[in-house]
């Protein structure tokens, strides 16, 4: 079973980071990769069963959501090659936040696993997750440096 794992430390308290990313239907914090995020069907961005269509290609379903654990899990039901439903199956992604208590920052981990013999999907999803995490860190870096006076 192929797996990808990516993480980053975001220079902001966990409450601020979670508040920014907790809505399954809001990817405005990731402008370098996500150009559109469409709510598909019924359900809000905080409800298990919510569906989204990213960039007209990635169809995801929210399968677990915890405000307490600051975690969401989703299935990828469709995507572009090399992660299309014809190339991989049983894809589960997880986004999880943890506080870094020594300096009031946030550890963000994003991982996924699926079934497939397709080895191209691993590098593809690593690039996707790295880009998303970089956008998230950059947003808070810009906010902090816009406010700080040194």
Predicted regions and their residues:
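Beta-strand/loop substructures that line and gate deep hydrophobic ligand-binding cavities in soluble
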Residues: 79-138, 147-149
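Hydrophobic pocket/interface hotspot
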Residues: 17-21, 27, 62, 74, ...
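Residues at beta-strand starts and edge strands
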Residues: 2-4, 56, 70, 89-91, ...
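Short, highly charged C-terminal tails/helix-capping segments
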Residues: 34-39, 138-150
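Short strand-connecting beta-turns/loops that link adjacent beta-strands
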Residues: 13, 67-68, 100-103
